[in-house]
Each structure stands twice: as structure tokens, then as C-alpha cells.
Amino acid sequence: AADYPFDDMLYGDFQKFPGHWKDGKLYSMMVRCGHLGVSYNKNAISAEEAMSYSCFWKPEVKGKVGHFDWHLPSLGMMSLYDGNGAGLWDLSSGQWKKVQNTTLSLRPQVGGYFDYGGTFNSLKNGEMQAMCGIGDWITGVLEKDGAPVASVVPKEGGIQWTESYCIGKGSEKADIV
């Protein structure tokens, strides 16, 4: 840890970020992070509507709600919508069943499941008007290019993601990192 300065971290919370440290020892280094919430086309969903995951059920976007192809963020968003808050992953069997039912109730709204390229293109060309499982790591690029899209963390909460580097114990090339 002495090789890596932490005094320039964006937020103090990230200096000893849980999961990267154990017993005072650094095991991985955060490279970038962001938040997942409601990503939407501003011509189809208002900023006010986007402040709740309920906008995914808006009749006007039927068949135009996309899902990023990794299930975890989408299920986490449904769990937040169901009121599970910070316990969104630690569910009883009843809570999990409710998340499943909420997710399945969204099916008529869904227009597709997309990888990175498909997510990017379907929002850019307007094929999808809202997207579960992403955030400004995609919409920020599209906004800079003039697309009428945005991402927000809604009132029910969002999901934080991080990408981190680590050097495996016994690495023969640790000195080049």
C-alpha cells in the first residue's frame, strides 16, 4: 500500500474501500467506479419520471425497455424497486419471490437484452427508450455525442460498481505494475 498514494482519492470513503482491504492490508486497487440506475431517452421519459424505476412500466415505452445482458444489475434494480434498500442482495425466500414476480411483470415492456455494443446502439438510435442495468458509463458517452439520453440514481436507490486491479501473489511481473 505504501507504493500507492491514497490522499488523492475522490472521496475519503474510497481510501479504505471494503473488499479491497483486509486486516489493514491492500489486496486490490480501485481503478474506476460508477452508479447504475435509470437510463432513459429524454424524449420518452421525463427527468421526474426517471426518478423511480416505475418509469420502466410506463405504457408509452412498451417494447422499448432494454436490459443489459448481465442479470445482476437488473435484478438488483428490481429488488430496490421492491423496497429492499441496502439489503437488496440479502433476501428472504419471500423477498426473492417478489423480486422474481416484479421482474417478470416487466416482460411486456422489454424489447431486448443487449451486450455493450447493442446497449450503446439501441439507445443511440432510439430503438430502446429506457435501459435496466446500466448508468452513465454508457449514456455519458452518448450525451456527449448529442443523443437525448441520461442516467439517474432514482429515489429507490442505485447500485455502485467498481473495477479494480490486483497483483496475484507470486506474480513474476509485479515490478512492472
Report the location of each language-model feature.
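Loop/turn elements at helix/coil->beta-strand transitions in domains of secreted/extracellular proteins
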Residues: 61-65, 108-109, 126-129, 146-149, ...
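Short, flexible active-site loops
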Residues: 116-121, 127-128, 160-165
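Extracytoplasmic ligand-binding site segments that recognize negatively charged/polar headgroups
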Residues: 1-111, 115-124
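Surface-exposed, flexible loop/turn segments at secondary-structure boundaries
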Residues: 73, 138-139
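Active-site-proximal beta-strand/loop segments in catalytic clefts of secreted hydrolases
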Residues: 41-42, 68-70, 134-136, 154-155, ...
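Beta->alpha turn/N-cap motifs
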Residues: 116-117, 133-138
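Ligand-binding "clamshell"
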Residues: 1-2, 22-25, 141-153
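Extracytoplasmic/periplasmic substrate-recognition and gating elements
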Residues: 133, 143-177
